[in-house]
Curated annotation (Swiss-Prot):
InterPro entries: CagE_TrbE_VirB (IPR004346), CagE_TrbE_VirB_cntrl_dom (IPR018145), P-loop_NTPase (IPR027417), P-loop_TraG (IPR043964), T4SS_component (IPR051162). This is Type IV secretion system protein virB4. It holds the Pfam family CagE_TrbE_VirB. Induction: Specifically induced within macrophages by phagosome acidification. Induced at 37 degrees Celsius in minimal medium, suggesting that nutritional stress is a regulating signal. The lineage of its organism: Bacteria, Pseudomonadati, Pseudomonadota, Alphaproteobacteria, Hyphomicrobiales. Transcription of the operon is maximal in early exponential phase. The keyword ATP-binding applies. It comes from the Bacteria. Belongs to the TrbE/VirB4 family. The VirB system could be required for the establishment of the replication niche in the host.
Amino acid sequence: MGAQSKYAQQLNNERSLAPFIPFRSQVGPTTVITRDGDFVRTWRIAGLAFETQDKEELLIRKDQLNTLFRAIASNNVALWSHNVRRRTWDHLKSFFSNPFCDALDKKYYGSFSGYRMMSNELYLTVIYRPVPAKISRLFNVAVHRSHAEILQEQQLAIRKLDEIGNQIETSLRRYGGDDGRGIEVLSTYEDKHGALCSQQLEFYNFLLSGEWQKVRVPSCPLDEYLGTGWVYAGTETIEIRTANATRYARGIDFKDYASHTEPGILNGLMYSDYEYVITQSFSFMTKRDGKEFLTRQKQRLQNTEDGSASQIMEMDIAIDQLGRGDFVMGEYHYSLLVFAEDMETVRHNTSHAMNILQDNGFLATVIATATDAAFYAQLPCNWRYRPRVAGLTSLNFAGLSCFHNFRAGKRDGNPWGQALTLLKTPSGQPAYLNFHYSKGDEDNFDKKLLGNTRIIGQSGAGKTVLMNFCLAQAQKYLHNAPMGMCNVFFDKDQGAKGTILAIGGKYLAIRNGEPTGFNPFQMEPTAGNILFLEKLVQVLVSRDGQHVTTTDESRISHAIRTVMRMRPELRRLSTVLQNVTEGSDRQDRENSVAKRLAKWCFDDGTGKRGTFWWVLDCPQDQIDFNTHSNYGFDGTDFLDNADVRTPISMYLLHRMELAIDGRRFIYWMDEAWKWVDDEAFSEFANNKQLTIRKQNGLGVFATQMPSSLLNSKVASALVQQVATEIYLPNPKADYHEYTDGFKVTNEEFDIIRSMSEESRMFLVKQGHHSMICRLELNGFDDELAILSGSSDNNELLDQVIAEVGDDPSVWLPVFQERRKARIASSKSTGR
C-alpha cells in the first residue's frame, strides 16, 4: 500500500474550479473562446455621471441604450454586465520646498486614513454564439471538420463580433468624458518583462478570486489556469480564500421586479461603504420567442385571475410594441454579491443592500439555494448557473443596466502633471481636481491647454478656504517646472494674506494714503518698459479730463528717457518731474504737464508732497518676481478710489505681464467683478482669458456675487473662456443667473441650492460633465487659521511679524501659540 500525504483526504475533497469556468483559450488580443465555441469580448465603460445629469438626459440615454440593444439583437448574441464596487486607495505624490505647504499636504493626505475610498467599475461583455442551440455546438462537431474549416469558422465569428463591437463602441463612447473615450476594450498587453498578459483574463480571474492581479496568456486551457482562490459554499454564505486574504460573500437576487425601471433605479447601492459585484445577463430572444413569452404571461394572468384588467391591457400593449420593434425580449438574470472580511460584517452589508433594493420596489431575497451557482454565474457564458431567469424587455434592461457612474476627473497626464489635489465625494469615489481640462487618457503634459477657473460661492460657504488651499497645493507645480512658476493673487479683504505669507510670498495691502511700495521707474530700462512708463505718465496727467497734446507727449518721453538713464536709486516720479520742461507762455505753464504731474510726486517741485505721491513715487520698488514667486495685492481700499485705481492697476498688470514669460503662471482674483470694473483690468482680463493658455498660464476668478460678475464689462470672457467651474452651496441661488448666465443644467442648479452650507461640498464642472466634491478639513484648526483669512487672525499676524520678522518658519509657531492663548483667554472670561 503506497504512502499517502498527511493531507490526502483534504486534497481529495478539494473542489476544482475548472468545471465552472467556461473559457477555453484566448484567440486574439480581445477575444476569448469557450468550451462550447462561444466568442467573448469585454469592455470597460467609464459610465455616465448620473449625479448631476438632468433626468431628461438620463431618459434619453436609456432610450439610446434600448436602440443599441435592438440593433444587435439576435439569438446568437448575449450580454453580461458587471458593476464592481471595490475599495481603492490613492495619494498624490508631491514635492514642496515650502514647509507650510509640505506639512499641509502631508496632514491632508494623512486625513484619508480610515476613509472609505471606493471605486465603481463598469464592464460589458458580449458573447457571440455561432450555434446558439444546446446541441451541435461548433466544437462538439469539430471532429468532422478540418483544421482549416475550424479556423475559417473562428475568423467569421470574430468578424461578426467585431461588427457588434463597433456598434457598441460607437454608441457608448460618450459614456465618460467629452472626449469620446467612455469605452475601452479589454485587451492583451506586454508587461515589462515582455510577457503577454490579458486584461480580459484579469477581469475574469477577479470575478473568481476577488483580487486583481496580472494574468499571463497561458498555453494551457483557461479553465485549468484561471482561479487563484478556493471557493467554499455554505447555505447562504460563500467563503473565498486566496493566498492573501479570506473573504465572505452573500448573494441577493430578485423574486419580483419593480413595476417601473427608471434609469438608475439601482444607483443607491453605489453610495454604500462595502464591496460588491452586480452581475446582470441578457440573452436575446427571437421575436417569435419573445411574443410567445408575453402571450404566456398574459394567459397566466387571465387563467389564474391574478391580473387586473389594466395588467392584461399592459400585456397587450407590450405584445404590440414588440411587434412594432419598440424593444426586444431577452432572458435576464440579476445577482448582487456583497463582500466582507468576516461573517458578521457580510450579514450586516447584505441587510443594508436588501433595504436599498426593497426601497426601490424590488422583492429581493438572499440566495440560500445553490449559492455557489450564483457565484459562478458571474462569469460570462455560465448560463446553466443563472439564478431566477426571467423574461425582460430590452427597455427594462436598459434601465437596470444603464452604466451610470461617478465623474472622477483626471489624475495623470495633465498639462502640469498630476492633478492639483484629491478630493472626497459622497460616494467615496476619488475625485481629481484640475485647473486645466484635458481629454481622457491622453498625455497632455506640457501642452498649452485652457485652464481658466471660475469659483462661485456665497459668504460662509468656504470660498476663501478653497482658494487658499488650492493656492497652497499649486506650489507643487514649481518642482517640475523648468522655467519656474509664479502666482499673483489680487485679493479682497485680505483673505489670502496669511496663505501668501505662509508660503513664503510677499503681500502688499494697498491702503489709501499709505505708501504702496511701488516705483515703476526702477524697472529695467527696456524699450517696452519705457513705452509703458510714457503711457502711465500720460494717464496720470490726464486723470481730470485734461488733454495730452503732442508736445506734452514729447516732453513726457524726453523726461522719462532721461531719468531711465540714471542709476536705479535715483529713478522715481519726482525725478521725472524735475526733467519735464514747462511751456514758454503763461497759459502753457498754468496747464503744463509739470503742474498736472506734481500731485503724483513725493516732491512737487516746491518741497511739498503731492496729494497722490504715495501711489507710484516710493523710494524703493517692492515688486521683484526674482525674489518672490508668490505675490498678493489687496485692493479693498484702492478699488473704490477712482483717482488712483487705474494707475495702480496699470502698473500691477504690467509687472504681471512681464512675469508671464513661459513660466507656469496663475493669477487669482477674489471678487473678480470688483477688479475688472477698472478699465485696465477689464481690458487685461478680456484679452488674457483668450491668450494666457499659450503663455503657459491661467486665471482663477472668484466671487460671492454672481450678478456682479455677469454684469461686468468682460462677462462673456469670464463665463465662456473657462475650463473649470466650481460652484459652492447657495440656498439663495438665482435660477436665471446660474442657468442662463453660467449655463448650469437644471439638475446642477438643484444640487447647488440643496447642498448644505456647512457640508463643505461643491460642484465641479468641466465641459458637459460635473461631479460633487468635498474639501474636508476637520481637525485642521491651525491650518484654517491661515487659510480662512479672518480679520482678527490677520491683525495678530501683523503684530507677530512686526516683532519676529517675516520668515514663516519663525512667525508661524509664535502666531499659533498666541492665537491659542487668545482663544483660551476668551473662553476663561466667557467672551
